[in-house]
């Protein structure tokens, strides 16, 4: 199965990038930011993103729209300080592009200023590793 990993972050903390790189290490794949278009079809696109102003960043939307013909299914992995998931926002864009979005999702808290200090932490990454095992099955 061809799996690709793409992420977007604008945070100075780099929580989303850390999560994407962790996934890449565990799956033996390179995690690239969304400025890198897909070069070939991906049966599963692991999309690592974060909540910004109650939505996903426009870079995520542009990436999905620009690569819709190469994506067979999106798996949403996200973090936020607010505790809100990006699933609905990603689903809206996927629906517009006729890209299936897996019901499997991983969401974790992320630190921002004084909120959720130290997150994602070791326990979060352990849960993420367990989640990754479910998508490989």
Predicted regions, residues:
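FMN-binding flavodoxin-like domain, especially the glycine-rich phosphate-binding loop
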Residues: 3-6, 11-30, 34, 41-137
């Amino acid at each position: 199965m061809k799996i690709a990993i793409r992420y977007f972050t604008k945070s100075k903390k780099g929580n989303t990038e850390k999560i994407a790189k962790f996934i890449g290490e565990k799956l033996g794949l390179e995690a690239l930011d969304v400025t890198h278009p897909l070069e070939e079809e991906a049966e599963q696109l692991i999309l690592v993103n974060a909540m910004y102003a109650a939505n996903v960043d426009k870079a995520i939307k542009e990436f999905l729209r620009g690569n819709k013909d190469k994506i067979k299914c999106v798996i949403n992995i996200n973090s936020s300080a607010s505790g809100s998931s990006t699933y609905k926002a990603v689903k809206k864009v996927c629906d517009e592009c006729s890209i299936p979005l897996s019901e499997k999702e991983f969401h974790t808290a992320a630190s921002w200023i004084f909120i959720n200090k130290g997150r994602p932490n070791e326990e979060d990454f352990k849960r993420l590793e367990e989640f990754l095992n479910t998508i490989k099955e």
